[in-house]
UniProtKB/Swiss-Prot annotation:
Family affiliation: Belongs to the LysR transcriptional regulatory family.
Source organism per UniProt: Bacillus subtilis (strain 168)
Ranges annotated as DNA-binding: 18-37
CDD domains assigned: PBP2_LTTR_substrate (cd05466)
Cell compartments where the protein resides: Cytoplasm
Protein known as: Uncharacterized HTH-type transcriptional regulator YwqM
Keyword flag rRNA-binding: no
PANTHER family cross-referenced by the UniProt entry: HTH-TYPE TRANSCRIPTIONAL REGULATOR (PTHR30126), LYSR-FAMILY TRANSCRIPTIONAL REGULATOR (PTHR30126:SF100)
Biological process according to GO: regulation of DNA-templated transcription
InterPro entries named in the record: LysR_subst-bd, Tscrpt_reg_HTH_LysR, WH-like_DNA-bd_sf, WH_DNA-bd_sf
Pfam families (UniProt xref): HTH_1, LysR_substrate
GO cellular component terms given for this protein: cytoplasm
Assigned keywords, A-Z: Cytoplasm, DNA-binding, Transcription, Transcription regulation
The HTH lysR-type domain, residue ranges: 1-58
């Protein structure tokens, strides 16, 4: 028993005319006759009585009509319920760094969860932008936040949200004055506290150092919070996004050195160009745009 057979039967039962039914449903009349015959064979009793050219709904047909209407109504209700669940549940796998999860995303997450409480959010850290982009290409992430320069990507949609300043910070008692410019040459004998290899702003900064023939000592950390603690302990100079250190600078826990990055980086949102946009994913993107803009 197929849904289309039930729809054909209901239409025929309401108009008691196979020719009109065929015209209304865009079927050949033979198709209508065949569908009704299949139903009658499956049920085991005639649904229509044919008296010459007249078509009469049998008592069995009248009884079956009420059930057929219920089946069709329940089918539509099931479709609507399923679509509603599909649109408001599920899982979003989001790539983000520690600093983005800590300083950028909490207000977005809060508002999103209020709108989509049944959608599960999984935030996955990554070592480098290239790793995050590869995970998008492989379908391991639905969307990712990256911190990078503006560049074109063949298979990805990359949208810059906000420019991020990169700051050079040191302990308050570091000998570098806060008001005098710091040059790359000044860093030759310093210890730099850096994020993991593959971080976009670290790569840009180190390229500038190497182009100038400067190779300072360096300590590498997985955690930005660890770098900040080491900066405040006087273990070296940190190169970090402004969002991660502005509160510490304002509170006097460390000082900003007079240095300007010559290559702007941006918080960006990226996803595969062929990614199917579910309602939760589209809402997350729209909310992120609204928050940053």
């Amino acid at each position: 028993m197929e849904l289309k057979q039930l729809i054909t039967f209901i239409t025929a039962a309401e108009h008691v005319n196979f020719t009109l039914t065929a015209k209304m449903l865009n079927y050949a009349q033979s198709s209508v006759t065949s569908q009704i015959k299949s139903l009658e064979e499956e049920i085991g009793t005639p649904l229509f009585e044919r008296l010459g050219k007249r078509l009469i709904l049998t008592e069995a047909g009248k009884t079956f009509k009420s059930y057929a209407q219920k089946i069709i109504a329940l089918t539509e209700e099931a479709k609507m319920a399923t679509n509603q669940v599909r649109e408001t549940t599920g899982t979003l796998k989001i790539g983000a760094t520690e600093s983005q999860c800590t300083y950028r995303l909490p207000p977005i997450i809060k508002e999103f969860k209020q709108a989509f409480p049944q959608v599960k959010l999984i935030f996955k850290p990554y070592i480098s932008n290239e790793q995050a982009k590869e995970q998008l290409l492989q379908g391991q992430l639905d969307i990712t936040f990256i911190l990078d320069v503006n560049r074109m990507e063949d298979a990805l949609h990359v949208e810059s949200l906000i420019q991020d300043e990169i700051k050079m910070v040191a302990a308050n008692d570091h000998p570098f004055p806060a008001d005098l410019p710091v040059t790359l040459k000044d860093l030759q004998n310093e210890t730099l506290l850096l994020t993991e290899d593959g971080c976009s702003y670290r790569t840009l900064f180190e390229n500038n150092l190497h182009d100038s023939g400067i190779y300072p000592n360096k300590l590498e950390f997985v955690s930005i919070e660890a770098i900040k603690q080491c900066v405040m302990a006087g273990l070296g100079i940190g190169i970090l996004p402004e969002m991660t250190v502005k509160d510490d600078i304002a509170a006097g826990r460390m000082k900003e050195l007079n240095w300007q990055s010559d290559c702007p980086v941006f918080t960006q949102l990226a996803w595969h160009k062929d990614k199917w946009m579910s309602a939760p994913l589209k809402a997350f993107i729209d909310l992120t745009r609204k928050t940053f803009k």
